[in-house]
Amino acid sequence: MMKIIFFGTPLFAVPTLKKLLDNPKIEVTAVVTQPDKRRGRGNKLIPSPVKSVAVAHNIPVWQPRRVKKNPETLNLLREAQADVFVVVAYGQILSTEILEMPKLGCVNVHGSILPKYRGAAPIQWSIYHGEAETGNTTMLMDVGMDTGPMLLKSIIPIGLLDNAVSIAEILAKDGADLLLETLLRLEDKEIEPIPQDNSLATYAPLIQNSDYEIDWSRSALDIHNQIRGFFPNCFTSFRGQSLKVMATIPVGTEYWSELPPELQKLEKVWSSESEVVGNIGEVVKVIKGLGPVVQTGSGWLLLWQVQLAGKKVVSGWDFANGTRLLVGEVSEVFSR
C-alpha cells in the first residue's frame, strides 16, 4: 500500500483527496493544510475545505503557518516515511528539505497544460487569453514554480460561455482522476518524467484588483474573456455606481454556433436588423428578453447578467427594465 501525505487547502483540492481516500491501494496518513481563517459576521475560525474532509475521515491534520520553518511539522513529515507527498493547491512553497523526504518524490497536479501558465492563477489567465483548451498536468516537484518534470497530462476544452468557476470544477474532478492514475503508474514504474521546455513557458501571476476593471475600448471578445476569466469580479461604472458584469455574449455571426438554445433569439434579432455603431461604452440596442448591447472598441457585447452594488445578480433584461435603460430615449454610457 502506498503511503501518502496530502498537502492542500481549497475546494479545488477536495476531489483529489477524496479520490485517494477511496482507493484501497493508497493510505493517506496525514493532511497538511493552511491554518484556519476568521470569516463571516461572527469572525469565526473556519477550517479549510481540505481540513474538513480530513477531520471527517479521522486523518491527522497539521496546520503550520510556515511549513518549511516549523521544526515540529518537519519532524512529523520526516518520521512519517511516506512514499509520496501529494500537493494540490496547498498555498505554501515547499523547501528542498521537504521535497527530498518522500521515497518517490512530491507529486503535484497543476491546472494548466505545462509549461504554459505556470503560477498561481492558471485557470483564470488561460480563459483571459482566449485559449480554446486547458487541462491538468501532474509533475514531480522541484524548487521552481511549476517547473518540475512532467508525468501525465489531460486536455479539457474551454467553451465560449465557460468561466473560471465552471472550468475549475471540471479540472478539479479531472485532476483527481489524473493524479490517482499518476500515483499508481509511478509506483509501477510505468511513467518516465519529461523535462519541461522552458522556452515555451508562460506565466499566470496573482490577479490584481486593477485586472477586474473593464476597459470598453478593448475588443468585445477580449472583454468577454476578461469577464469570464476573472469571474465573478469584473466591474464598470453606471450612473456613478459600481456595476459588476457577471456574464456577457459577444455579438456576431462567428459566435452563433456556440450559443445555447436560450440565446438563439440573439442571432435572429441581430441578423434581422442592420448593425449599429455607437460611441465606445454606449448602449446601442436593448434586445427584449435579453438585455443591453454595448459598443466596444471592436464589436458589440450583450450584457447577459449584471449586479449593481448592494443588489442581487439579475439578467441584462431585468437590469434594463429596472433602470429604464432605453436606447433612443436615453443613451446611457458605461464609463471606464
Swiss-Prot record:
Please state which protein family the record places this protein in: Belongs to the Fmt family.
Catalyses which reaction(s)? L-methionyl-tRNA(fMet) + (6R)-10-formyltetrahydrofolate = N-formyl-L-methionyl-tRNA(fMet) + (6S)-5,6,7,8-tetrahydrofolate + H(+)
Q: Does the keyword field hold Ribosomal protein? A: no
Keywords linked to the UniProt accession: Protein biosynthesis, Transferase
The record's CDD domains line, in alphabetical order, gives: FMT_core_Met-tRNA-FMT_N, Met_tRNA_FMT_C
Q: Where does (6S)-5,6,7,8-tetrahydrofolate bind?
A: S112, I113, L114, P115
Q: Name one GO cellular component term.
A: cytosol
Top-level division of the source organism's lineage: Bacteria
| EC numbers | 2.1.2.9
Q: Name one GO molecular function term.
A: methionyl-tRNA formyltransferase activity
Q: What does this protein do?
A: Attaches a formyl group to the free amino group of methionyl-tRNA(fMet). The formyl group appears to play a dual role in the initiator identity of N-formylmethionyl-tRNA by promoting its recognition by IF2 and preventing the misappropriation of this tRNA by the elongation apparatus.
- Name of this protein: Methionyl-tRNA formyltransferase
From what organism does this protein derive? Trichodesmium erythraeum (strain IMS101)
Q: NCBIfam families, per this entry? A: fmt
Q: Name one Pfam family in it.
A: Formyl_trans_C
Concerning SUPFAM superfamilies, the annotation shows:
FMT C-terminal domain-like (SSF50486), Formyltransferase (SSF53328)
